[in-house]
């Protein structure tokens, strides 16, 4: 795209979603209006409506690819034979997703409107329930459920944190590895032995 060429519709849509996530971080989903997004982008509200008629439609577009990826991780994890192997696969896959999507994970985990939307869509709720079960099954009963909740809440909290105040910025690979290590400790999993 050369200077002066208007951005493509797809590029505008992606930029709109990026700005929405940033505003969701600052103001929550409920605290962010389409008007705020249009103001931030310098677009008219009608330009926003061209892509998304409502904030919920925008939120759907943001959530859909993430939940599709979580679903793929869940399905691959469920194919493993043992409870621990299933949990470890879910853990490593979700840690990689969280590391790639830190801003999004920090916003989407715990925002009341996001939770409401997840619960309203049966297929999305089912994905989250299956994910939780993969973590919780490591320790049957309420203890496993609590550990699963701590793990997911911890990932969201870690994604929100600003690490540069400590040792400098944390890159994606280092962040992923730290999430995996903390998750294994939380669930009582050992790292798989390296193949010879």
Residue spans of the language-model regions?
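Short linear capping/connector segments at secondary-structure termini
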Residues: 108-114
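Solvent-exposed, amphipathic alpha-helical segments
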Residues: 19-26, 69-77, 154-162
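Helix-turn-helix
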Residues: 15, 19, 23-57, 61
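Short, intrinsically disordered or compositionally biased N-terminal tails of bacterial proteins
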Residues: 1-4, 194-196
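Hydrophobic/aromatic-rich alpha-helical bundle segments in the mid-to-C-terminal region
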Residues: 106, 117-125, 129-196
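Hydrophobic alpha-helical connector segments
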Residues: 61, 72-106
């Amino acid at each position: 795209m050369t200077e002066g060429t208007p951005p493509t519709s797809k590029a505008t849509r992606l930029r709109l979603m990026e700005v929405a996530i940033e505003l969701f971080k600052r103001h929550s989903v409920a605290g962010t209006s389409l008007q705020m997004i249009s103001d931030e982008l310098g677009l008219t509200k009608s330009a926003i409506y061209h892509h998304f008629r409502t904030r919920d439609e925008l939120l759907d577009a943001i959530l859909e690819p993430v939940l599709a990826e979580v679903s793929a991780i869940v399905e691959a994890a469920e194919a493993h034979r043992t409870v621990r192997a299933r949990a470890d696969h879910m853990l490593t896959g979700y840690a990689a997703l969280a590391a790639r999507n830190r801003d999004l994970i920090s916003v989407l985990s715990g925002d009341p409107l996001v939770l409401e939307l997840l619960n309203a869509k049966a297929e999305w709720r089912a994905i989250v329930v299956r994910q939780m079960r993969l973590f919780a099954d490591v320790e049957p009963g309420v203890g496993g459920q609590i550990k699963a909740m701590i793990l997911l809440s911890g990932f969201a909290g870690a994604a929100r944190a600003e690490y540069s105040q400590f040792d400098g910025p944390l890159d994606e690979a280092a962040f992923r590895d730290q999430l995996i290590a903390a998750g294994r400790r939380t669930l009582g999993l050992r790292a798989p032995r390296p193949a010879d």
